[in-house]
Amino acid sequence: ASCGIAYAMRYVRAAVEGGVDLGGSGMIAEKIVLQTVKGAVELLQANGNHPEAEIDKVTTPGGVTIKGLNEMEHAGFTSAVIRGLKAGLK
């Protein structure tokens, strides 16, 4: 559905903005984010694992990944995505 594409693009936009906020150039940040999203999709398509199983493979206790994921969850990432999906159906 086109709304799903827009939601995914909103994540891409936010991640690019984050890269710029960290001091990178917009063009480089966009290339990194697009390759990251492409890699995640290809990984899930190739092995059929649940996304959480793949997240667990790249997450270590106290590491950068878990710290970032925890911050996103504390800010309501999953809830915001679910609420957005539901709002689109009202």
What are these regions, as identified by a protein language model?
Residues 30-90:
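NAD(P)-dependent Rossmann-like dehydrogenase/reductase catalytic/cofactor-binding core
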Residues 1-20, 31-44, 63:
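Active-site-proximal catalytic alpha-helix in oxidoreductases
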Residues 21-23, 82:
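Short, surface-exposed linear patches
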Residues 25-29:
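Membrane-interface starts of transmembrane alpha-helices
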